């Protein structure tokens, strides 16, 4: 069985643990945006708070997932000891930061413009602490090739999360608690992770190695900075809307209203992000495990080529079927932002390619380049949002995201060629992307009033595109899958 086939199989299983749970979580948008639950300005507060959470989570992990993969796969390494070292570092950082947030929750709440709601900060601090404590155990499941266990843990958690959201917001809803239910549901659902990894966590003992621990921190902190910059790129546009959107830009509506619309439509673009995440979970340990193979450059190039094809299918399928996907957003007032979804889908496609290209600085121990490239992305994000938001509102934020991720991808590719020669099929990849965009533009320019006819036509377009790609790629794909 070929290595790519193995990777594809693991990606499917990680999809069960990432795409399905996050897609189910995505369906919660329908509940949260219902007119009887949260108005756009309330949903905007949720969007803002989880944006801060994503940034802090990256700091808590401190790049230890990737550091664990790197040090545990070195020749002669003791995987169990490396695991304990990584877990010790993460827990030490997480307890310190989460404890500080809890101790000063009221002050933090005032700082982020939710004065009087310090309990939200406390909820989020505990949620982030539990996420961090189980992050390395989940990474270990990936390294030990246990994607089924990974999937079970994620699926049960999301099942609890959905059930609790439905119970709190439909059965036992109290308007005085409001958005607090969302954080409370996350907190209770996360407690399952502690039970799921109870044996691993109870067996863990803090350990420090005066040689390996500093080396892991030195390797991991550029990864953390890269991740922090990456999260900033992803989340900054949402926070920037709150700060830089001119008053009354959307007539009669607040910045929180615009942020709510933008955040809800962003969720549709997360369909691409889910596929990227599932692939990354399988691919990252795969790249490290196959780094010593002489044929690895050609292997990595083929993997990226097929990855781009799959992403193009997602881009096409979602972009020309927004008349169906819009119903996931609940109240019709959220639909006004649907036109930004294709822009964000394309942005996430570039982000996925960037993750593939970034293998060169991880395998050559030049992780500082990841920091340099992503900090450049942050600067691009800040400037683009500053220029575009006052002129185009949340559409400007969408274009800023695309400009950032595409620029990072280009920089990573150009610099990486100097250190690790990987024969990526850049021309073929770009051709597929351009063809997809042309089809999206053409199809969306055609107005079909009958919804059933429109949906059928769109499905035929997607199926036809997939068949054409299959006939173009069938020979090389069969050869690839047949290789040992």
Positions of PLM-derived features:
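N-terminal membrane topogenesis motif
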Residues: 1-27, 77-84, 210-226, 473-484
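Interhelical loop/hinge segments that connect adjacent transmembrane helices in multipass membrane
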Residues: 1-7, 175-182, 194-234, 282, ...
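Signature of the first transmembrane helix
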Residues: 3-65, 94-102, 127, 158-162, ...
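Helix-terminus/linker motif at the lipid-water interface of multi-pass membrane proteins
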Residues: 24-42, 109-111, 172, 231-271, ...
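Interfacial segments at transmembrane-helix termini and the short loops linking adjacent helices
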Residues: 40, 105-124, 256, 318-349, ...
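Specific pore-lining/lateral-gate transmembrane helices of multi-pass inner-membrane transport
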Residues: 73-88, 261-374
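Hydrophobic alpha-helical transmembrane segments
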Residues: 118, 122, 151-202, 218, ...
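Membrane-proximal transmembrane or re-entrant/amphipathic helices at the cytosolic face
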Residues: 442-484
């Amino acid at each position: 069985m070929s290595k790519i086939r193995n990777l594809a199989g693991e990606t499917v299983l990680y999809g069960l643990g990432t795409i399905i749970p996050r897609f189910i979580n995505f369906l919660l948008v329908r509940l949260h945006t219902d007119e009887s639950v949260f108005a756009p300005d309330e949903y905007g507060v949720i969007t803002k708070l989880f944006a801060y959470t994503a940034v802090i989570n990256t700091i808590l992990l401190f790049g230890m997932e990737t550091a664990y993969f790197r040090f545990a796969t070195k020749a002669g390494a003791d995987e169990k000891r490396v695991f304990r070292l990584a877990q010790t570092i993460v827990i030490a950082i997480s307890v310190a930061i989460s404890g500080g947030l809890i101790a000063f929750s009221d002050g933090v709440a005032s700082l982020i413009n939710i004065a009087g709601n310090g309990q939200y900060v406390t909820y989020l601090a505990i949620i982030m602490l539990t996420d961090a404590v189980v992050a390395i155990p989940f990474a270990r499941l990936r390294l030990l090739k246990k994607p089924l266990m990974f999937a079970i843990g994620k699926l049960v958690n999301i099942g609890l999360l959905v059930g609790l959201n439905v119970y709190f917001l439909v059965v036992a809803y109290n308007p005085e608690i409001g958005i607090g239910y969302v954080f409370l549901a996350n907190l209770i659902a996360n407690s399952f992770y502690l039970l799921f990894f109870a044996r691993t966590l109870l067996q863990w003992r803090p350990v420090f190695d005066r040689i390996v621990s500093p080396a892991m921190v030195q390797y991991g902190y550029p990864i953390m900075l890269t991740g922090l910059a990456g999260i900033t790129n992803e989340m900054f546009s949402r926070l920037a809307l709150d700060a830089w959107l001119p008053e009354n830009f959307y007539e009669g509506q607040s910045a929180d209203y615009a942020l709510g619309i933008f955040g809800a439509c962003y969720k549709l673009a997360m369909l691409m992000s889910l596929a990227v995440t599932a692939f990354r979970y399988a691919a990252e340990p795969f790249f490290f495990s196959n780094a010593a193979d002489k044929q690895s450059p050609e292997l990595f190039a083929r993997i990226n080529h097929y990855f781009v094809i799959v992403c193009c299918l997602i881009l096409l399928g979602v972009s020309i079927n927004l008349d169906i996907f819009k119903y996931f957003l609940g109240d019709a007032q959220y639909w006004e932002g649907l036109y930004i979804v294709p822009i964000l889908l394309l942005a996430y496609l570039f982000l996925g390619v960037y993750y593939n290209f970034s293998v060169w600085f991880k395998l050559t121990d030049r992780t500082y380049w990841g920091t340099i490239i992503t900090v450049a992305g942050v600067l691009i994000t800040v400037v683009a949002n500053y220029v575009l938001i006052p002129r185009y509102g949340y559409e400007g934020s969408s274009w800023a995201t695309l400009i950032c991720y595409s620029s990072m991808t280009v920089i990573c590719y150009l610099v990486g060629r100097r250190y690790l020669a990987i024969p990526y099929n850049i021309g073929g990849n770009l051709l597929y992307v351009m063809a997809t965009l042309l089809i999206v533009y053409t199809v969306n320019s055609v107005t079909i009033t009958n919804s059933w006819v429109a949906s059928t036509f769109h499905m035929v377009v997607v199926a036809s595109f997939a068949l054409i790609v299959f006939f173009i790629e069938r020979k090389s794909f069969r050869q690839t899958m047949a290789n040992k």
